[in-house]
Amino acid sequence: GQFPFPRDMYADIIRELYKREAGLVVFNVLMPEKDRFGKDNVLGNTLKQYPVVLPALGSERSKNTNHGSPAQVVGMDPAGLVVEYPGLINNVEPQESLAAGVGVVNTFPEIDGVVRRMPMVILSQEQLHPSLALETLRVAAKDPRFQVKISDMGVEAVRVPKFGKIPTDDVGRVWIDWSASPREFSYMKLPESFDGGIVVVGLSAA
């Protein structure tokens, strides 16, 4: 949506991160509406120059254009065997078509409401779409496809060829390691160099 900054500021952030030797930038900021400041083309021009992975959201409805999925499915039709959403909310143009990759950010709460697992893939509009994490691995590896093997028992394997198999349950979910402590930085206090690492950009009201 519109919160909180005009998108030329996002473009500035992307350029600054690559100036500081980011290997890949991932934006966990969905942009389903046009920028009210009219800066979508400024961000689009930056996405032409620098690889950035953007999010999408599985939903009851669809919004904006889905440009397909880099999935290679081996085996059975995934319908009824993976997490499924009728629609997909994508980013506005030109962001969606210029992104290096697009991955969904849906979680999968347990019956008690706690999020312990999240899907690596979802099915929407008859296509298998990667999670933001899986798409980040694919883009970082420069692989044209990610692969999913499906049998009548469900998901048997999810993999990006360069990184190997990702262990999932039979509907393609992975357990979340909440004990992991990724390095966090304020935009006002960035390191001199990210040494080729993957940088995930999120927003906080704090």
Regions found by a protein language model. Give the residues of each.
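Non-lumenal N-terminal regulatory segments of integral membrane proteins
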Residues: R173, S181, S204-A206
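Non-transmembrane functional regions of envelope-associated proteins
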Residues: G1-D169, S193-A206
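N-terminal domain-start motif of subtilase-like serine proteases
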Residues: E184-D195
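Short, well-ordered turn and helix-capping elements at secondary-structure junctions
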Residues: I122, A180-P182
